[in-house]
Amino acid sequence: MDFKGQVVMVTGGARGIGKAIAEGFARRGANLALADISLDSAEETAREMSGYGIKTMAVKLDVSKSEDVSKSFMDITKELGRIDVLINNAGITRDSLVLRMKEEDWDAVLDINLKGVFLCSKEAVKIMVKQRYGRIVNISSVVAFMGNPGQANYSASKAGIIGVTKTIAREYAGRGITVNAVAPGFISTAMTDALAENIKQDMLKSIPVGRFGSVDDVANAVIFLASQDNGYITGQVIHVNGGMYM
């Protein structure tokens, strides 16, 4: 899959899954706009990705603020000319059992994880409608379908992303825009690596393939959905979870 000449925007693109997604696009020739709450981290990742011989841009962005979002999209289109692909990856957690969860923790997670997808998608669609082409891929989670103790806010936000994905897909399918979601399961990160061995073994028992996913497993699914090869898949959720949810 070739993305030469295309501009890909990744929110939360400085670290973790977002960085892996960005690098996957960079290897395939896409120009990158990396939007992150940490400008320093975004700039560091942008410098790293520029080693692939592409144009890169780092943007400080709080996806829950409509003014920030509008300005970021304006800045990106001014600098890079267009936005062909939007990856809504920015997200946070504020874990607690329901009886202990503070209202501000509920609001914070929904604002970033769900409202952020709405605000960024709205700005992207404005651009993509004029281009009569666009790809939006939203990062959901297996907990949107299974739930997870201590994550009522996170599960709700990731489930909400599915509804937003399907609705925008229906609204703009006739304009050359596809909108899909990827729902990762347990992905190997620094946090999972630090878990006690007995906890990791218990988690692995729920995964039929017998291993944690990698950030590249997620990135590969995202890249296909965002490619020109995918013109007939829209409004769908691709599960990347090793079979823990079927």
Each model region followed by its residue ranges:
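The beta1-alpha1 cofactor-binding region of Rossmann-like NAD(H)/NADP(H)-dependent oxidoreductases
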Residues: L39, L61-K71, E103, D216-D217
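Short, small/polar-rich loop/turn modules that mediate ligand/substrate recognition or access, typified
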Residues: R82, A173, T178, I233-G235
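Active-site helix of classical SDR
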Residues: S121, S157, T165
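C-terminal substrate-recognition "lid" of short-chain dehydrogenase/reductases
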Residues: Y133, R211-V240, Y245
